Amino acid sequence: VTESALILAAVWKWFPPRRWAVCDGVSYGWGLLYEADAIAVSKAGRVHELEAKSAKADLARDHKKRKWLLPAQVDYFWYVVPTALTDPAVALARPRGLGVISVSAPGANDVIGNSVRLLLPKPLRSQNRVRDRSDRPRLWRLAAVRYWDERIRKPKGETR
């Protein structure tokens, strides 16, 4: 299962784009010093970061990073993993209060696979901080810019 398939399955199941502002590949435009696989913003303004990991070594390497110790822009952090990595992801995530979404491989009649939320994350920062109401529209703008940037760069006739 590819990392992009993991993110797609998790987003469609738990962060449906009609109810959440969702954008993939977010970094500087959101104020992050690294690229997040996906960001989802709720109507209440809560920001969820989704990080897909498809290999145990990649999961362990990412977990050693300190990006969630100074959560300026992210309220909740989720690992999105294939079912084979569920136990290692839960073991790493639980002590830090991170969430885990496990995604099975797609079946014959299922394009994006089934996802099961296994571990709910704890807030990374104080929920009392008032978030700017411009966060959702700002993320939608980022998503639109990213979409058209990809369309312009994609060779003619190539499909996704």
Q: What positions do the PLM features span?
A:
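Non-catalytic C-terminal interaction segments of nucleic acid-processing enzymes
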Residues: 1-14, 89-160
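A generic local structural motif
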Residues: 8-9, 37, 62-67
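A short acidic/basic microdomain associated with nuclease active sites
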Residues: 15-31
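Anionic group-transfer/hydrolysis microenvironments
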Residues: 26, 39, 53
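Acidic-and-aromatic substrate-binding clefts and catalytic sites of carbohydrate-active enzymes
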Residues: 29-32, 58-60
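Active-site beta-strand-loop-beta-strand hairpin of nuclease catalytic cores
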Residues: 31-49
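Catalytic cores of nucleic-acid endonucleases
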Residues: 47-48, 53-103
